[in-house]
């Protein structure tokens, strides 16, 4: 049965007066779709022409958005000694070895990003089922397994977005807030799409960005012109 949308949603749909928008227009249009009482997240959805079952087509990484995400990010760092001190100085919220491991074991995942030094990864293996589904397992591809914990903490606090395609090639990321001006939404989107385009696998066949849309948490989607998106390099 078709999903019945609310009257509010139907009114918002009327504001989307074109089938596709270029990115700049879409950044302006999503601001017109604000309807919730809270500061909605601006979400970018992409469908990529990749098959993540092939290791070389698993698109995964991170990018620091020029204007951040608008979200206060809580960072935990699994490290000891001098590296723990560096993480604290850089502004990490939770730092340590036993303390952090105990939190994870108890299912107390009161953080948005977990960073670990390489020597700590052996201790995290048994927590794969806890951290994996939440996207919290540190990974070198997202810069969260590193000896440079200070820079990783700064990146996380500055608005680093970690991303990966699902098994069907879809990807959803928050790139800002409805309260951002349209130019900031646009520039964040450009930074993200440039990163995705740079990661196009040589083995991917056909169109790389197949579908793309911008939306707010509670709004309909504004469809993007995928031909334009391929030009951001």
From Swiss-Prot:
* Pfam families the record matches: Ribosomal_L1 (PF00687)
GO BP annotation list: regulation of translation; translation
Q: Describe its partners and assembly state.
A: Part of the 50S ribosomal subunit.
A cellular-component GO term for this protein: cytosolic large ribosomal subunit
Q: Which gene encodes it?
A: rplA
Alphabetical UniProt keywords: Repressor, Ribonucleoprotein, Ribosomal protein, RNA-binding, rRNA-binding, Translation regulation, tRNA-binding
User: Which family is this protein grouped under?
Assistant: Belongs to the universal ribosomal protein uL1 family.
Q: What is this protein called?
A: Large ribosomal subunit protein uL1
Q: Which Gene3D superfamilies match?
A: 3.30.190.20, 3.40.50.790
Q: Which HAMAP family match?
A: Ribosomal_uL1_B
Report the protein's function. Answer: Binds directly to 23S rRNA. The L1 stalk is quite mobile in the ribosome, and is involved in E site tRNA release. Protein L1 is also a translational repressor protein, it controls the translation of the L11 operon by binding to its mRNA.
Which PANTHER family does the protein's record reference? Answer: 54S RIBOSOMAL PROTEIN L1, MITOCHONDRIAL (PTHR36427), LARGE RIBOSOMAL SUBUNIT PROTEIN UL1M (PTHR36427:SF3)
Species whose genome carries this gene: Nautilia profundicola (strain ATCC BAA-1463 / DSM 18972 / AmH)
Which top-level group of life is the source organism from? Bacteria
GO terms (molecular function) for this protein are: rRNA binding; structural constituent of ribosome; tRNA binding
User: What positions belong to coiled-coil segments?
Assistant: none
